[in-house]
């Protein structure tokens, strides 16, 4: 069956299946320019640093693990995931989908810094026990070490001043001094509110990002003015403790979607500055834009000369490309590609790349009654404008009551599920909408809608999920095939959503297999073939 994977990849490269399919990073136009968004995929809460000629970025993935992806770039456009801060979180059993879940919690906005040869990253889950994580490394490509647990600081930004003192900016204008090694807060150190919100702000100021430029301190944040739209603001001061003055540095809708705000600025070492800011785009999640940053009267003004996010501009550095953020996989490697993430901590004994060479085996590890509490659901992002994912599954190892398949996974999920009922297997297109307890995020209810069910005639099945994230679309469509050529649509189109009250992330491709009766059944996944469609 690998031949089907190779053929599909060849057709994709030749443009034979979809004429606008590309392998390259979605923002790179291949002619020295790039188009925004750089990532039309879920890459929220970016923090970016430059060390020499290398850019590093961290983003938020919350309840997915491994978590806190660290990406590397040479040009701010082409990025690749090189590591994660952690393989799992173990503060409480919810991370294992026991006694509740951590949907929409886990790893939130992370701060990334480089100081005296060491890279630092800090984040704090928006959840009990409300303690932050500090990770360090000498090389982001070689993994990270948990070095300390310090107090919870919401949407924080680490900062090392020229005198070696360490600080953390957080919340709505809070400043706290830390020990230089970030092992704890500094006893008797700075602990203050550096400004008060003015009257036009009616909510939290969030997403702190701090830099020092020409002797001044700049704190970038997102704000929501009364009766207005989200925007990027900047507070600046001559002293770290203030007084601070404020200016709006970006207030712009882009391409018909909501306003662009929350991120940071970074220079290229040659005097040029850029903003790296995200934008909400509904079902696909929060997408990444890159734009000029112009210093005007000592303020970092974002966007073009008119303050707008440019649709297309020259790449900051020429000559680089990348595989992309979402990738195909024939599961022939010794490890999963870094593009994959599990939903919550995986049961590592229940998945394998070695049980059957060239296949990913997912073995049932816990008896559950729904996808939202099923362990070992494997995900990748979906991308706009359009994308398509095909998975080939060998179902012969399934047991009675097992459920396996492919999902457009979110709080509202579109699901293409194979169910094993005795000796017969059925394919169902259905939707499920989860209800979560506010305290521990346990599943309190699921609204289910079975749309179409067909009896399968083969133990080898190809499942396809197409996503359309163009303006006012957010549509998922489902198909199946016995030969990867003759495709039959099943069910109806499914509307993908973004809901901060539940998952707080964009919709994901999700591969799954879980038991509803007894353990030990398995499916073998031959490949996942991904196509990104630019038009």
Regions found by a protein language model. Give the residues of each.
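Bacterial Sec-dependent N-terminal signal peptides
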Residues: 1-25
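Carbohydrate-active catalytic/glycan-binding domains of CAZyme proteins
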Residues: 21-535
């Amino acid at each position: 069956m690998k031949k089907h994977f190779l053929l599909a990849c060849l057709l994709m490269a030749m443009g034979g299946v979809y004429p606008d399919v590309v392998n390259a990073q979605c923002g790179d136009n291949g002619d020295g320019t790039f188009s925004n968004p750089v990532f039309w995929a879920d890459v929220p809460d970016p923090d970016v640093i430059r060390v020499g000629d290398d850019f590093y970025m961290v983003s938020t993935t919350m309840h997915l693990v491994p978590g806190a992806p660290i990406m590397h770039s040479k040009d701010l456009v082409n990025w690749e995931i090189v590591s994660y801060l952690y393989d799992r979180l173990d503060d409480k059993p919810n991370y294992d989908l026991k006694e509740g879940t951590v949907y929409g919690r886990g790893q939130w906005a992370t701060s990334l810094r480089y100081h005296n040869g060491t890279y630092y990253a800090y984040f704090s889950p928006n959840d009990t026990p409300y303690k932050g994580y500090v990770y360090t490394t000498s090389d982001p490509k070689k993994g990270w070490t948990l070095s300390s647990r310090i107090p919870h600081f919401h949407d924080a930004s680490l900062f090392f001043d020229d005198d070696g003192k360490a600080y953390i900016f957080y919340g709505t204008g809070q400043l706290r001094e830390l020990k230089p090694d970030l092992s704890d807060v500094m006893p008797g150190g700075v602990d203050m509110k550096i400004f008060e919100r003015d009257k036009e702000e009616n909510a939290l100021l969030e997403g702190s990002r701090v830099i020092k430029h020409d002797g001044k301190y700049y704190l970038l944040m997102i704000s929501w003015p009364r009766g207005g739209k989200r925007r990027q603001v900047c507070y600046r001061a001559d002293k770290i403790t203030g007084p601070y003055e404020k200016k709006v540095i970006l207030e712009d809708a882009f391409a018909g979607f909501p306003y662009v705000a929350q991120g940071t600025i970074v220079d290229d070492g040659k005097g040029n500055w850029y903003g790296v800011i995200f934008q909400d785009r509904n079902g696909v999640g929060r997408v990444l834009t890159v734009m000029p940053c112009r210093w005007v009267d000592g303020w970092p003004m974002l966007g073009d000369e008119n303050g707008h996010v440019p649709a297309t501009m020259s790449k900051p550095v020429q000559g680089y490309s990348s595989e992309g953020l979402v990738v195909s996989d024939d599961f022939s490697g010794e490890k999963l590609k870094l593009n994959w993430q599990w939903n919550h901590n995986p049961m590592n004994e229940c998945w394998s790349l070695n049980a059957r060479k060239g296949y990913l085996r997912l073995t049932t590890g816990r008896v559950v009654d729904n996808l939202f509490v099923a362990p070992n659901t494997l995900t990748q992002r979906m991308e706009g404008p359009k994308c398509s994912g095909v998975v080939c599954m060998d179902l012969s190892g399934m047991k009675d009551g097992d459920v396996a398949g492919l999902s457009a996974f979110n709080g509202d999920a579109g699901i293409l599920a194979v169910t094993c009922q005795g000796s017969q297997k059925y394919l169902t297109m259905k939707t499920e909408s989860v209800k979560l307890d506010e305290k521990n995020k346990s599943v309190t209810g699921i609204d289910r809608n079975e749309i179409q069910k067909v009896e399968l005639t083969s133990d080898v099945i190809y499942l396809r999920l197409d996503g359309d994230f163009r303006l006012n679309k957010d549509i998922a469509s489902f198909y199946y095939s016995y030969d990867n050529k003759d495709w039959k649509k099943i069910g109806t189109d499914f509307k993908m959503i973004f809901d901060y009250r539940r998952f707080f992330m964009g919709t994901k491709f999700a591969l799954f297999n879980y038991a509803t009766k007894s353990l030990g059944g398995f499916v073998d996944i031959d490949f996942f073939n991904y196509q990104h469609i630019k038009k």
